């Protein structure tokens, strides 16, 4: 086992022609995150001293998307093979460090497998990640003598006997910096593809008497690459099934694990229940006994104990204290905050608004840029008119206020404690405590009124 420092090289220069997309292949997302970001995260979790990202196609988009402080951007202007890609990064290698080679389109490689690979790397030799396949067609074969790895032969260059070998190269390896630089300098493109294969260094190491140790991943999905959208979709389901299994074993009740997506992280309490077709994005926290109805989307939000979110509600960048109820068909936008026991019903939208303890907005309401006190009733059709066409303004409502249906609160405006606002009122001025406010056009009755008759 090597105790050397370690840097990581991630190959991410490919165009991804079979994705049929203008987006670089490695920026296509898995579980809501670019594939290459999964690999960068694994490198960081391993404690890499540096991460060298070899890029080519779509470099500007890559730079706009990835913002890791320790990324060293290495341009591969021409894509002439994996060995050529590593040659571009080689000037940045330290002689006394280990270099781990990863791929931006192999997103599910686990930290645990990479730790085992690093631990298995012999001094002065190479650690190689391999798998055995029933159908190895198209993959580089691992050649052995007396069970010792001697080289890798690409499928197009393999003999018929070599093509019967089931152990294949995953492309992931680790070697010392000084050794790797020396071997990379010796690579040639004398092969069927006319490319520089990184795999040729295995034979070089063997000829020098260096040991090559093969390690197998825990799961085949860890080393599956993505070349088209079908493969990406399959890996997405593999990843989601793994997340669902972990949650079920940790006590979360997923009504249908096959219809649940976690696209980020979830912290959860006890006795959490999640119905079908729920999507959790970003960093989500669910307290004890939280219930999430079917079809809900929750992003970067904290949901307190005993909250219930009814079906088809969307909660984004919001904070819910204990015992709140939401939906169905509610939308909490960034900055929404519900204090203990608050209720937001169907077709209610909140943004940058706080709803106090025990307060209710039952239906068909917009609350934006608002501070609403405790024990307030917001009637159906109420709107905080917060935008004047250029700027946003705030509405402040005190405690124990009753807001009748179809009320418009034209901000900036402040409503005192204990106020009653009659249905159909347009509030344009501040209201003092305990006042009744109404503004209606006088009701007109015309006896004997007849409706117009259509002209023929």
Curated annotation (Swiss-Prot):
Binding site for Mg(2+): 105, 227
Entries under InterPro entries matching the protein: Bifunctional_GlmU (IPR005882), GlmU-like (IPR050065), GlmU_C_LbH (IPR038009), Hexapep (IPR001451), Hexapep_transf_CS (IPR018357), MobA-like_NTP_Trfase (IPR025877), Nucleotide-diphossugar_trans (IPR029044), Trimer_LpxA-like_sf (IPR011004)
Single Gene Ontology MF annotation: magnesium ion binding
GO process annotations (BP): cell morphogenesis; cell wall organization; lipid A biosynthetic process; peptidoglycan biosynthetic process; regulation of cell shape; UDP-N-acetylglucosamine biosynthetic process
Cofactor-binding details, from the entry: Binds 1 Mg(2+) ion per subunit.
Keyword Metal-binding on entry: yes
Pfam families: Hexapep (PF00132), NTP_transf_3 (PF12804)
GO CC terms in record: cytoplasm; membrane
Coarse class of the protein's main subcellular location: cytoplasm
Record family assignment: In the N-terminal section; belongs to the N-acetylglucosamine-1-phosphate uridyltransferase family.
Quaternary structure (record): Homotrimer.
Protein name per UniProt: Bifunctional protein GlmU
Organism: Klebsiella pneumoniae (strain 342)
